[in-house]
Amino acid sequence: PNGCGKSTLLKSLTRLIAPVSGVTLLDGKSLHSQPTKQVARQVGLLPQGPVAPDGIRVIDLVSRGRYPHQSLLRPWSPEDERAVSAAMDATGVRELSGRFVDELSGGQRQRVWMAVALAQNTPILLLDEPTTYLDVRHQLELLELCRELNLRDGYTLVAVLHDLNQAARYADNIIALKEGEVVAVGPPADVITESLVREVFGVEARVITDPESGSPLMIPRWGSGVTAGVGT
């Protein structure tokens, strides 16, 4: 649910904030003791509500995803060009390359930011509500892309999703949080249960098996413990 610590958790996994207690490890070493560029070559982040610099074009923003791989001794290279090109193709934003980011729709911007994360070409990718602003088609395309990155290319992906049915369909494992605490961890069938939906979200629901995917499918029981308001 909202405010349970999902975004805070992702930020702590990318050095944006330091944990108050405990330690975050990357390859067995403290994440916060490693050089920033070294971490950025291993872990990519699509944050919630990113803001692009004024007057920047799509191609230039996506190219910034290659910054962790560059240095004085290694300027822009054909490898960078290939990574940017592949990221734009994968997210369907190549036709937007010459446009200014601030003139795009919310859904187009979200796909551009996904391209930035992909151009970074990290083995670990953290996505904070990646389907925000996207219509149903582009939501499914993005989630299918994530699945492909995992199965074909070996990426490790961690995504914050509010749609339980999408999470159940695409995730190998789900972590349910409530008020900053981990409530459940495991495969979708073990986590997406009627009792957990009631405990975490305060929603009475029926959970059945999706006949298409075989994953759990949550169907809210409106009128049974939930009050739905309609604005006027």
Where are these regions (language model features)?
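Conserved ABC ATPase "signature" region
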Residues: S63, P78-L96
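Conserved ABC ATPase signature
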Residues: P75, F100-L104, Q108
